[in-house]
Amino acid sequence: MAIETNRYAEQRQQVTGPDPRWRPTTADEMRAYVGMNVMMGVKQLPRIWCYWSTDKRYGDPFISGVMPKTRFLKLNQYIHLRDTSDMPGRDDPDYDPLYKVRPLLDLVSKKFRKVYKPARDLSVDEAMIGFKGRVHFRQYMPAKPTKWGVKVWEVCESDTGYCSNFDVYTGRKPGGRQHGLGYDVVWNITKPFHNKNHHLYYDRFFSSVLLAEHLDMVSTYVCGTIMQNRKGLPAEIASAKLKNNGELLQMQKGNMIATSYKDKRQLTFLSTSQQPFQGQGKPTCNLNYNSHMGGVDKSDQMRTYYPVGRAGKKWWRYLLWFVINLSIVNAHIVYTKSEKDPAPKKGYDHLAFRVDVAEQLIAGYTCRKHKAGKRVALANQVVAPETIGHHKLEKISGRKKICKECSVQKRRTPKGRHIETSFFCVFCDVPLCRNGCFAAYHHRNMMT
């Protein structure tokens, strides 16, 4: 991350001109930056500047003590994960919509499967990363709490919500799909768990007779709701209209059992992991589905308690913060189930674990050169003037003014505002930044 951030900052400055407020970052600083974003999700404030406010009602000394606000915003401006100078175009066969974050996504998904082996029961469902900006694979889900955003398919352990694999949905594939989207999602995302006797639970969006048959061939068993008109279902199930509560109709073919059951409304299930139901009350497939389908919802719930990262225009950053947040949720699950560590102390919950993760990422890092008490004294000292011939740089007695050189070079703050300075050239009566702009402005004018 540090290498690519420095590379991107250099590439941008080749286009827009030198940035006097930027200096190369390091791995330690980027870890601290991530830790600050994690902590901001715990201590949520409405504006980014609030964390550095001197007003005790807003300010957060822990976050503001790591680095100045200007440095944090500079890292926000230039953070990058991959060199995009060689990114394939949309017409290229190698085009990947997730090119900017692909290495991170692949690395993290492999780590999820390596560090923890899930139990038998897994649920497959969709999650949403809230995003209202511009990206061609943004989705609208009116029935979801988060209606606009990027859709992510997840397979999670039913009991704990541990996410073992995920895949970002980037829209329709060229050439279409042979068996449909639902089939492809479940088959591809559960490949690492084939031939391991897992039981999968998913809803009717994914469910089909063909998918259940193919998963059964790789010793992976399913239970889920299914649309009554799906191809391959028995005609009796497809046409069933149950009238009384508790009424049940079952049809079996090999390991596959199709069940139609009337509760408050008529439900249809397809299962290869259950035995035919012969008792009273709700059938086994219904009970197991209700018990094991909520794995993805558990993971989502833990992730939304403490969101990581701030809102912005760049879609890929939402995926970065999603991965970091999901990693913390998974890490907490692994910690609580670990046999190597002693039993967690009373009160050491997800919140306490998350705060410790943020603190260890920061690990005492600070890029501040002066203590807070000394900064006030330094601000009142007379700044030594800089000179170039008869041109002299001095401090403006009143409020700051827009830097002439920054304006010419079209530099802006991360929020798009003009850059202001507290210094000006006495001879030219031109406001100029102390670091770089004073010399650059006069050198350019002398050359012309």
Where are these regions (language model features)?
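Acidic, contiguous segments within the catalytic cores of piggyBac-derived transposases
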Residues: 1-448
